[in-house]
């Protein structure tokens, strides 16, 4: 450790394996100062311009916005975006963005009003009096992300560093050819960059602060040294020009001699790195109170007449910037966003500038050279020699091409920084970086699917466990309810058990009777009498119910009378056809006659108790009386014409007598209840009564004969 610290004091630097030295081509754009670009008419602001999820929209179509006004809310790793100028929100819809595949992402489209009015700005000039948490939250809510190309939220990165950061590294290497955005920013705004570095140091409290810059930027080195002349807490380290010395792991090793482990982060070894442009954005957010709405973009290439570095508002269409730089496209013109090694070709020029856009390269045909056809790998190992991450690009190429994801993961394809050094030196012109990007995307998709499947499985298992717990709790409640009755139920159960035990004791107790005495059966007799009384009461109640139902309906009574008459006729026919030798028991005939008289009296009572409002039609009564007289005449004729040897059936005679008496009484009641205006013929009534008396006398005489 002592040797390591002494090496730091001597400004010792280390060198990493691999790397290349391509033509720099930086002099095209780093010789002119930063300039402003006229406002575009329309701005397209994608909601996601960083690593992580997009924020929540807080504006709607038709809203008036000011420059710096939040368009989304930032929570967690969601970084907000802000309006680049004042104007009106005309649409919120998907739009193609800065992506190798030009994927469409949800964007806010603003029509500028030309006034470019800011929101009220509240700067914290005394930021040292603010807490660490307040500063980190302000940096996050003002939309600051890594401007070196990764786009990781700066606030989240500072929060994750915590108290374990010992070394703060400011990346000023800018190693890729053509790009001079950081170089020009340090030349024109060195004091503001250093102020942003001091804010980061105040938040992290590291033991040392290192600025790493390549030796191909002499003007920027001079400006930084001038600003840091009286500072002893910040060290400026000039390193040799080598690509890709600006990589995070490579620059960390160059300045500290420490290597970031495979699959790890620089914070694991106590190092945190920020870009020069990010430090400048932190200064504007904290001290000036300005959210990030613009950044420095390099416009370069031989197809551009006015190359240089400009302040480009976020959301400005690429076409607008190129036109301002006097873009002269050829027939098959190519425009690259980023550098020639790590950038990607734009499918069209309507994509907007975002936070990670640091360069727009429009090369001529001479700069690009003739397109080379991809050849087969010759296993020369030049790619392995040039790889700064100590990987085996040749093996990764075969694994990627053969869809062998497990082997590619085992060979640490995730550590590939996609610098393009392997593709630069490949004699077979194999686009290795494209294969590696595709392979990493496929592996990420597979892991995402596995994660979703694991989450779904966890949710299913949690649901099953919850259902099992609920079932067990439900069974336990039922069991408790069955075993533990309420207090009143317990008392009732105890009383019932006591009665049962008492009865059992009485049943098992022997009855002792002394000699000459009788057992006391009074209790048994009383119980028997009580049961009989209860049965009689129930029978009487049932009989009253039936009688009430019968009396309440006079129609039913009439129907029953008709049925009785039909049964009587049928009985007469059966007796007439019966054999003469079969004699009828006179006692049975008397019993049946008595039953008939009882039924007749019951019928009279029912008719007398019938509802008064139901009046008997006198016409019907007269008709029935006529029918009765006709039947009587017919019966007399049959008896007169009968053979002397045929004996009269006493049962039939008794029934007919009972029916005749019932009809006579019914006729009398009907006549008594008839309307006064409808008078009955007294002669007919007298005749009917005489006939009834004659029939009754005959029946009585026949009964006497039978008894003799």
From Swiss-Prot:
[4Fe-4S] cluster 1 binds at residues 377, 380, 383, 426. It is an enzyme of class 7 (translocase). Keywords: 4Fe-4S, Cell inner membrane, Cell membrane, Electron transport, Iron, Iron-sulfur, Membrane, Metal-binding, Repeat, Translocase, Transport. Pfam families: Complex1_51K, Fer4_7, RnfC_N. It is a peripheral membrane protein. [4Fe-4S] cluster 2 binds at residues 387, 416, 419, 422. Binds 2 [4Fe-4S] clusters per subunit. The keyword Electron transport applies. PANTHER family: ION-TRANSLOCATING OXIDOREDUCTASE COMPLEX SUBUNIT C. This is Ion-translocating oxidoreductase complex subunit C.
């Amino acid at each position: 450790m002592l040797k390591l610290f002494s090496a730091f004091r001597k400004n010792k630097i280390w060198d990493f394996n691999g790397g290349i030295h391509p033509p720099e081509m930086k002099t095209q754009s780093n010789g002119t100062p930063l300039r402003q670009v006229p406002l575009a008419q329309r701005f397209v602001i994608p909601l996601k311009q960083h690593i992580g999820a997009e924020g929540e929209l807080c504006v709607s179509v038709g809203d008036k916005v000011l420059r710096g006004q939040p368009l989304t809310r930032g929570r967690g790793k969601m970084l907000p975006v802000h309006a680049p100028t004042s104007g009106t929100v005309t649409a919120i819809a998907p739009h193609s963005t800065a992506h190798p595949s030009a994927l469409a992402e949800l964007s806010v489209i603003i029509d500028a009003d030309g006034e470019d009015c800011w929101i009220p700005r509240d700067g914290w000039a005394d930021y040292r009096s603010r807490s660490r948490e307040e500063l980190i939250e302000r940096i996050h809510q003002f939309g600051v992300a890594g401007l070196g190309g990764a786009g990781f939220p700066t606030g989240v990165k500072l929060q994750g560093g915590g108290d374990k950061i010992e070394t703060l590294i400011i990346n000023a290497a800018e190693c890729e050819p053509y790009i001079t955005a950081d170089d020009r920013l340090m030349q024109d705004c060195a004091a503001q960059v250093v102020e942003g570095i001091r804010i980061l140091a105040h938040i992290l409290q590291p033991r040392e602060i290192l600025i790493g810059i390549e030796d191909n930027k002499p003007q920027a080195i001079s400006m930084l040294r001038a600003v840091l002349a009286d500072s002893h807490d910040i060290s400026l380290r000039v390193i040799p020009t080598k690509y890709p010395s600006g990589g995070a792991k490579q620059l960390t090793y160059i300045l500290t001699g420490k290597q970031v482990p495979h699959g790890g982060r620089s914070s694991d070894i106590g190092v945190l790195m920020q870009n020069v442009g990010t430090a400048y954005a932190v200064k504007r957010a904290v001290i000036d109170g300005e959210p990030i709405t613009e950044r420095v973009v390099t416009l370069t290439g031989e197809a551009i007449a006015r190359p240089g570095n400009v302040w480009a508002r976020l959301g400005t269409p690429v076409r607008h910037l190129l036109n301002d730089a006097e873009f002269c496209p050829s027939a098959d013109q190519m425009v690259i966003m980023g550098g020639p090694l790590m950038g990607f070709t734009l499918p069209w020029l309507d994509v907007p500038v975002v936070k990670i856009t640091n360069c727009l390269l429009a090369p001529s045909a001479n700069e690009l050279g003739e397109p080379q056809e991809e050849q087969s790998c010759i296993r020369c190992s030049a790619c392995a020699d040039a790889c700064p991450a100590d990987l085996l690009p040749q093996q990764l190429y075969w694994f990627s091409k053969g869809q062998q994801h497990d082997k590619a993961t085992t060979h640490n394809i995730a550590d590939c920084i996609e610098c393009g050094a392997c593709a630069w030196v490949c004699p077979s012109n194999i686009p290795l970086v494209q294969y590696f990007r595709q392979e990493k995307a496929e592996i990420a998709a597979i892991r995402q699917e596995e994660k979703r499947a694991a989450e779904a499985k966890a949710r299913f298992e949690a649901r099953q466990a919850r259902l099992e717990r609920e079932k067990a709790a439900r069974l336990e409640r039922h069991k408790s309810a069955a075993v533990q009755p309420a207090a009143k139920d317990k008392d009732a159960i105890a009383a019932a058990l006591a009665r049962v035990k008492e009865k059992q004791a009485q049943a098992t107790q022997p009855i002792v009777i002394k000699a000459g005495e009788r057992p006391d059966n009074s209790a048994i007799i009383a119980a028997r009498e009580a049961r009989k009384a209860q049965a009689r009461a129930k029978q009487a109640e049932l009989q009253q119910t039936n009688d009430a139902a019968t009396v309440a309906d006079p129609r039913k009574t009439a129907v029953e009378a008709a049925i009785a008459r039909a049964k009587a006729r049928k009985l007469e026919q059966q007796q007439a056809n019966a054999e003469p030798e079969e004699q009828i028991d006179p006692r049975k005939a008397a019993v049946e006659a008595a039953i008939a008289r009882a039924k007749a009296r019951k019928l009279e009572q029912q008719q007398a108790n019938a509802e008064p409002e139901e009046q008997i039609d006198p016409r019907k009564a007269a008709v029935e009386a006529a029918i009765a007289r006709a039947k009587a005449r017919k019966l007399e004729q049959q008896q007169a014409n009968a053979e002397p040897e045929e004996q009269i059936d006493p049962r039939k005679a008794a029934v007919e007598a009972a029916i005749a008496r019932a009809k006579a009484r019914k006729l009398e009641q009907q006549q008594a209840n008839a309307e006064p205006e409808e008078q009955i013929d007294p002669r007919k009534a007298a005749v009917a009564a005489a006939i009834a008396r004659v029939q009754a006398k005959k029946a009585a005489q026949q009964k006497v004969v039978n008894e003799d």
